Amino acid sequence: MRVAILRITERSWEINTMLPWKSSKKFSNHSIASTSKWLVHQVANFVTWHETAKKCGAKIRVLPILDNWLIDENVLISTLSEKTKLVALNFVSNVTGTEQPIKRLIQLIRKHSHALVLVDAAQAISHIKIDLQDLDADFLAFSAHKIYGPNGLGVLTGKLTALSQLQPLFFGGKMVERVSNNRITFAELPYRLEAGTPNIAGVIGFNAVLDWLQKWDFTAAEQHAISLAESVKVRRNF
């Protein structure tokens, strides 16, 4: 796994413009899967892939949401094929608080396609302890401010094999290893994705937050949140 610190606060969704098929019409018969019902979906996610599909000629396959706000797994399976390039999933809704069974969904995607999997963990990152290796997503993204950090930092983590497919979006210092009049050699991952002077103050502040979070009991915090939700249900007779 590698972690890239980016200056985009919308959870590093600009990876859509770093994928090699971002503007190639040869993917006109391929698809990108995403979830429906804007109440459940993060707008930054959906809009990003909608625009990408228009540029590269791909089709967006929208996954329906059941009455319990979970993705319809049967439709997910029927949507997947060898032409599915990527599936973008929301871990937790920023409106309903619904937590998708993200690990099971990824397992289904692996079983029925070769698609890349991108997880929006913005709303989950401060409430759920996430094991990246166990989750098996190709990409996972969130903003630092979603986990008590400073504004202005987008975090993109992923498998080395997946990140290696990304092409730099911005260009500048730090991202290069060697420069000559005729050739530029980009630095290794993740540095090739971190062009220009970084948000130094933000990174230092976020590092302090991460040190503090090492002492955080995510399991206890998650159980407390569940307890509060159950209490609300009882009081409002849901």
UniProtKB/Swiss-Prot annotation:
SUPFAM superfamilies linked: PLP-dependent transferases
Modified residues (N6-(pyridoxal phosphate)lysine): 146
Keywords, comma-separated and alphabetical: Pyridoxal phosphate
InterPro entries the UniProt entry points to: Aminotrans_V_dom, PyrdxlP-dep_Trfase, PyrdxlP-dep_Trfase_major
Disulfide bond positions: none
Family: Belongs to the class-V pyridoxal-phosphate-dependent aminotransferase family. Csd subfamily.
PANTHER family cross-referenced by the UniProt entry: CYSTEINE DESULFURASE, CYSTEINE DESULFURASE 1, CHLOROPLASTIC
Protein name (record): Putative csd-like protein HI_1343
